[in-house]
């Protein structure tokens, strides 16, 4: 699984994240984790389910939110893409206060 091999990189990106959605390509879906998952869920009006993941090497639960690549393609037309690779996208979005994420 993506998190097993890239968890440190993903969580490092999410640590201070307040206005970016980091998306990772998984087959026909794009997955967002932690704060990116929260932002994506708010942006898409909960079109998908949020999954809570637990890893033995990470002390906190990690949120995961997945969308079909067609839905993400629509989002890319409406939002600024900061980075685009075949298996990684970064979208700019509105700023979130850390307090609103932790609730």
Regions found by a protein language model. Give the residues of each.
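Basic, polar low-complexity surface loops/patches
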Residues: 1-103
């Amino acid at each position: 699984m993506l998190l097993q091999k890239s968890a440190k990189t993903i969580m490092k990106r999410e640590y201070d994240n307040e206005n970016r959605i980091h998306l990772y390509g998984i087959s026909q879906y794009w997955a967002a984790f932690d704060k990116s998952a929260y932002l994506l869920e708010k942006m898409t009006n909960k079109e998908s389910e949020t999954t809570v993941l637990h890893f033995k090497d990470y002390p906190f639960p990690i949120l995961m939110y997945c969308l079909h690549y067609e839905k993400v393609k629509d989002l890319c037309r409406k939002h600024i893409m900061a980075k685009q690779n075949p298996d990684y996208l970064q979208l700019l979005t509105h700023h979130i206060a850390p307090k609103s994420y932790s609730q």
